[in-house]
Amino acid sequence: DSMFEWLNDNLPNGSKILEFGSGTGTIELTKSFEVTSIEDNEQWLYLAPDSTYIYAPLVNDWYDWQALEILQDETFEAIIVDGPHGKANRVHLIDWINVYPNVFNQSRFVVIDDANDTETWQFVELFKQLGWELLHHDPGNEENMGHNWSVFVKIHECPECGEEFNRYNDMIECCANL
């Protein structure tokens, strides 16, 4: 699948990835990356033996916030949004990002699976309002039945010199020594 190729081309081997929603693709991800998988379906738990799973049952159509608290001080190179089941429910991630912005602000980029689907549209629009910009879109093809995904980046500009960074912490360190 081209998403794996894109990630391999754009992330150093061994990079930490957080994925909302896991599946058979998690097995492929763990071949190159250190993966943490948030999963609400017990049947998918531990499918990829090399992934670290966080079991987070759904509460009000979104992963249990208490189960996700463990993530608040974690840093990931990339985040993949492919859950929970029922793509319209992804809109609840916006509330979580607003409470724990660091998890996303430290990420180099965010991959949103099925970004072009009508069910996901509201989430993608709200996500862009948080300052995330489209970097890459793969519309899918006949071979993968139109499976589409998009990559978003957030630019953090140094207020001192104007240099742009993908990660908030890198921007903070830019002119800190002035």
Language-model segments: residues:
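Short, non-ligating residues that shape and space the ligands of small metal-coordination modules
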Residues: R167-Y168
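SAM cofactor-binding core of SAM-dependent methyltransferases
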Residues: S2-N60
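Cys/His-coordinated zinc-binding microdomains
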Residues: G162, C175
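Short SAM/SAH-binding signature in class I
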Residues: E74-D82
